[in-house]
UniProtKB/Swiss-Prot annotation:
Keyword line: ATP synthesis, Cell membrane, CF(0), Hydrogen ion transport, Ion transport, Membrane, Transmembrane, Transmembrane helix, Transport
NCBIfam families: ATP_synt_b
Protein name as catalogued: ATP synthase subunit b
Location(s), subcellular: Cell membrane
């Protein structure tokens, strides 16, 4: 605004120099007008720039808060899903254990059934063998009886034919018994 004029003679006007450095009423008014202009400019810029910037920052802050809330919610859901899956895994493991236990029980029962069936079959075989032995014994007894009858009839024929005395008769019976063996009579 103010400038110093240099005369063609090369001398400066000292009144102007004093005025630049001196505080007078004009300078105070200019500073007040400039301060008022800066204040008005600040209000206008605040309305035009700072409010949108604040709104932008507030929106960003709200969006970040929503994202944090959403991530906390997602984390909570993930934790809940994890606990649900762990519970399902435990339940499945328990079911597997139950199935294996049931399978073991069935296998053990089947094993016991097979052993019982084998015992029954073995008992039947032993009974059948005992019956066959008894049958063979009775056949042998019948054969021995038939043999004794045949020997007795031969002896009777000899006694009648030769009129054998009593000592001779005892001797013939003893011989017949020796031929058949003592075991036959003991069974």
């Amino acid at each position: 605004m103010y400038s110093t004029t240099v005369l063609a003679t090369g001398t400066k006007d000292t009144s102007l120099v004093n005025r630049i450095f001196g505080l007078d009423m004009q300078l105070v008014v200019d500073v007040a007008i400039m301060g008022l202009a800066i204040f008005v400019l600040f209000l206008i810029l605040s309305y035009l720039l700072f409010n949108p910037a604040r709104e932008l920052l507030q929106k960003r802050q709200d969006r970040i808060k929503e994202e944090m809330d959403s991530s906390a919610k997602d984390k909570k859901e993930a934790t809940q899903l994890k606990t649900n899956y762990e519970a399902k895994i435990k339940e499945a493991s328990k079911e597997v254990d139950e199935i294996l236990s049931e399978g073991r029980k069935k296998a053990l029962k089947r094993e016991n059934d097979i052993v019982d069936e084998a015992k029954v079959e073995a008992s039947r075989i032993v009974d059948r063998a005992n019956k066959e032995i008894e049958l063979n014994k009775s056949k042998m007894k019948d054969e021995v009886k038939q043999e004794m009858i045949a020997v007795a009839s031969v002896m009777a024929g000899k006694i009648i034919a030769g009129n054998i005395d009593e000592t001779k008769q005892k001797q013939l019976i003893d011989e017949a018994l020796n031929e058949m063996g003592d075991e036959t009579w003991q069974n």
